[in-house]
Amino acid sequence: MSKEFFWGDSLTGTKKEVKWNPSLDDEDDFDNLDSDGIQHFLFLKQAVLGANAKEGERNVVEIETENFDGDNVKQPLFSLKLGLNESSPLDIGIQPPVTFILTAGSGPVFLSGQHMIEISADDEEELEEDDEEEEEEDEVEVNASPDLPVAKSKKRPLSTSDGTAKKTKMAKLDKDADKKEDDDEEEDDEEEDEVMAMMDDDEDDEDDEDFEGGEDDEEEDEEESDEDEDDEDDNEEEEEEDEDEESPEKPLKTTAKGKKGQMNGTTTAKGDNKPKAKAKTDTKLVKGKAKKKVLALDEIKGKLQESSNVPKKEEKFKNYVRSAFHISEAKKLQDLWGWFRASLQK
């Protein structure tokens, strides 16, 4: 522990020396401390020439103290002159004993600084105990003073019981307050858990919607491809009909046209050919679907990169790939998932 105090003194023509050597005998606050447990330091900060100094007179101040070896040392500290340099900043820390001497001039020269007292940890505890004992003694003296009314001394035990009751009540209030804080914290934690659970549910719903949206897109693509194949089959049928009309068997069709009664037969013949065309179309669709199932991993990766509705969770991703690309092999699914997860981290 350390304490700091302001320090100041002056040197004049009649007071040429100032000694600084504080001791425990002069300190009322440290009566019970050892001299080894306390240290004094003086930090000089400023030297100022007084207003009554003589013009043109040089004032020289010398310091006398002990060095590390315990030898006596004398050294000029500063020099002041009115009109030239009337003050001098200082930054010197010294320990007692110290003597300041005005070796030249008549002053006045004013010294100022900081007096710091360092107290060891053991002595600090003793000092605190002494302070507590003094406070208790003061309270006892006040209570035992004859100047106090008798009624007050009689009421003291009651005040003590009241104080105990107040302390008990305060302790109970503190306990209730702590319990209430704990309850509030638990409620806050529960609310946070509920919010997090709701957020997770929302994310799952979004992933499900994305997955369903991806399946719908795939089904639409398949329907469009089927429609395109149907259109191609219809075009092929029309071309075949055109070729039949241009073939050498044209007189037979002309005869059929001449006889109106046989139009139904001709229509029936054309109708008999249509189911065969439809069967061809179904065969082509089956072949087209079979080709779709056999997709290379690079093609699947390309489609996944183009799609914006791919789920970002492993299980949903695998379900999506199974449904969209008809892949059931666990190794391929795991490879695709590893590639997709790496692409997300880029």
UniProtKB/Swiss-Prot annotation:
Alphabetized UniProt keyword annotations: Acetylation, Cytoplasm, DNA-binding, Glycoprotein, Nucleus, Phosphoprotein, RNA-binding
Ranges annotated as biased composition (Acidic residues): 123-141, 181-247
Keyword RNA-binding: yes
GO terms of biological process kind: chromatin remodeling; mitotic cell cycle; oocyte maturation
Protein task: Binds double-stranded RNA and both single-stranded and double-stranded DNA.
Family designation: Belongs to the nucleoplasmin family.
Name recorded for this polypeptide: Nucleoplasmin-like protein ANO39
Annotated organism of origin: Patiria pectinifera (Starfish)
